[in-house]
Amino acid sequence: MWTVESECGRLRAVLIQESIRGFWEGKLPFTGIESSTHYLARCPHADIDGGKEQWGQLPQFLEEEGVKVFEVASILEKALEDATTGERRQIVERVWEGIPQAPPAEELTLGHLLSGYPERPYYDPRSDRVVLPDFQRVGWPYPRDTSFTTQVGTVICNMRRYSRRFEPRVVRLCYELDPTLRERTEVVYDASRLDLGSTEPPCVEGGDTQIVDEETIAIGVGQRSTHTGFMEATRRLFEADTDGKIRYICAVRLPDYPALDYMHLDVVINYPDRGRALVMPYFFESELVPDMPPRRLLLKTLEAVRAQAERDDRPMEPVVHPNDFAGAGSCAVYVRGGDAPRLLRRCPSLIDFLVEEGKLEKDGLIYVGGRPERENDVEHLMLALMEQARGASNIVTLRPGLVVAYERNHATNDELRENGVRVKEWEDSYLDMLGGPHCSTSPLWREPA
């Protein structure tokens, strides 16, 4: 069985998702922020041809390093070509479970799976109404979020974002229909099919989940993954771990809405090499790394932004409050218990936990935007915030000391190189500010660091 044993060991197999048309041109306006084209306004000049050309560099980078690449749409297209009517009927039942109308099995197409049923909106003159696709199931090129593989098997995620709620159903089909994935992977927990009847949804997402090493998993809890989702996933993973591989599973606190650029753990920390981490400065606190840029400067900057907004009589609702970052980066460490995971201890910082456990070197931190030149360097803070928003921290490691990173984050990429990390620069003028190389890859098989 394929497993993932680290974030920076040699990457052997990966799942990617080519959904460029759905990303930019398949979203309907007027249906709320999660489907509105206005949500993409931070990258207003995106065009499908340029974006597709740039996205195509990703599988090239992976294959150059010998990584076996599986792509969602290609898997589904091949499966439909070979499927009998009975097999198509099973697919329809799985994907459209609980949905009133579904395509006839004999008419099922790839477009139905990705874009919804019907495939395209149309005007029906008989009823004098516009008919819309029921749900766009694959509209984002970020398979990291919908499933993740651990030391003990694969988890299908439960998405908190409404626009992605049915995407895991389609992604799970890939694990079942591709012959290699069916043989080499094992789904040990499908969170998308879970209903605990609780007031908080049991959401857990792959962008929040990091396999730090052979015995440690970190899961961010905040805008996407919930505490309920974390606890249930932790329980299921310990249950699946019959050989006792997993020692620690850490819940890492993340800012809540409206701090949208901090929605997942993988936008504030990643691992380019053994004992090293690329981190967003001003986010984590540390008692063990005294020269870490302090969060206090970020909070003071947020205070200034809010004061300026109030002075100018601008709406305050979407402006991040300093309290949104209270406790950010702290972690609760869980170990195997009797009937449920047991809280071992709380740490003021994930960084300090990793240093204490020998999983991260004290001098192994590499900062987004490089190091500040002076104390309370607000210009450096602004640079780090801008590069982080463009996905600077969202690198994916192909093997120890070799990463794929977005090209436009010059300061961060230079800092990686100065610390001995080789960088494959991914052209990103059409791609960044919504997700990066880490989001765009879901490791299926990765060696220990």
Annotate each PLM feature:
Residues 1-449:
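The feature marks the mature, well-folded catalytic cores of soluble enzymes
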